[in-house]
């Protein structure tokens, strides 16, 4: 049976450091503040928001939920983002995505509207450029950075190792590939047009799967000695699960993250760390 790379100790360690930094800001009269902005009221967002608000309290971050109508126009969402940009008391903003179907065509433009210094989830072009180049102030998307934080916490060095990333989304696959390259890993990215993903994953030292497909990572994809980070949160009809056929894969590989309780539980802690670092920079009261 594989070693379980659980997220709680990782999130707790990061949260303790974040709270120390938040308390230093509070002693100077600065309350780190995060706005969670969403359109509509769906349960999937609700579960994430509840976890984020709980983590914010542990980290000394004030989290405020601003909910727009599900049928809000692009102009209404833009105005809400502009309000965040203008408010000096707000240091970070997370726009819950995906947006409702009628706004999907406007999503990129709305994300780009946020002031980059308040972009704590890597959704602006400036943040993407910083992740790609390794230069600038932009934050990586929280889930991608959570993968790297988890690897570091468990002493898993990606330098010189072959990492296979399954998925190429701008939220996980692409940015985590860039972060792995920054750590001198050799990275292969698989996607829906990859002809034989299993042939590539079997050669990997580290597998990060973010396909969003139940049981898409099977025993045929893995070998002994590998590290598997399962990023996806899928519904299999009875509960949450990742991409991996967990019983089969965990009986073969060296270590694996559970779902739930793995990478996802670290993501909200990264979000709070980003918010405090943004507050340090925006107020000039810390070394972000």
Segments predicted by a language model, with ranges:
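Rossmann-fold NAD(P)-binding glycine/threonine-rich loop
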Residues: 108-129, 230-283
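Short beta-strand elements in bilobed, periplasmic/extracellular small-molecule ligand-binding domains
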Residues: 56-70, 187-189
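Short beta-strand segments
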Residues: 38, 94-98, 166
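Short, well-structured alpha-helical segments in soluble
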Residues: 76-88
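Positively charged, low-complexity intrinsically disordered leader regions
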Residues: 1-30
């Amino acid at each position: 049976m594989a070693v379980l790379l659980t997220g709680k100790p990782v999130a707790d360690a990061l949260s303790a450091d974040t709270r120390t930094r938040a308390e230093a800001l509070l002693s100077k009269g600065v309350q780190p503040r995060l706005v969670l902005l969403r359109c509509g009221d769906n349960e999937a967002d609700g579960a994430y928001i509840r976890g984020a608000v709980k983590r914010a309290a542990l980290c000394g971050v004030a989290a405020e939920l601003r909910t727009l109508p599900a049928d809000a126009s692009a102009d209404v969402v833009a105005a809400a983002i502009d309000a965040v940009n203008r408010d000096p008391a707000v240091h970070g903003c997370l726009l819950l995505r995906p947006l409702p179907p009628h706004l999907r065509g406007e999503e990129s433009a709305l994300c780009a509207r946020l002031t980059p210094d308040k972009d704590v989830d890597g959704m602006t072009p400036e943040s993407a450029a910083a992740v790609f180049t390794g230069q600038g102030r932009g934050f990586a998307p929280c889930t991608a950075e959570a993968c790297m934080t988890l690897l570091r916490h468990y002493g898993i060095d990606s330098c010189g190792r072959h990492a296979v990333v399954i998925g190429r989304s701008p939220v996980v696959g692409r940015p985590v590939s860039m972060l792995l390259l920054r750590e001198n890993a050799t990275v292969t990215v698989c996607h829906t047009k990859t002809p034989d993903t299993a042939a590539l994953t079997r050669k990997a030292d580290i597998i990060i799967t973010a396909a969003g497909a139940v049981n898409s990572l099977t025993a045929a994809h893995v070998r002994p000695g590998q590290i598997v980070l399962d990023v996806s949160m899928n519904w299999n009809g009875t509960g949450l699960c990742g991409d991996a056929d967990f019983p089969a894969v965990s009986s073969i590989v060296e270590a694996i993250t559970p779902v739930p309780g793995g990478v996802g539980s670290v993501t909200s802690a990264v979000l709070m760390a980003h918010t405090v670092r943004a507050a340090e920079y925006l107020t000039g009261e810390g070394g972000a």
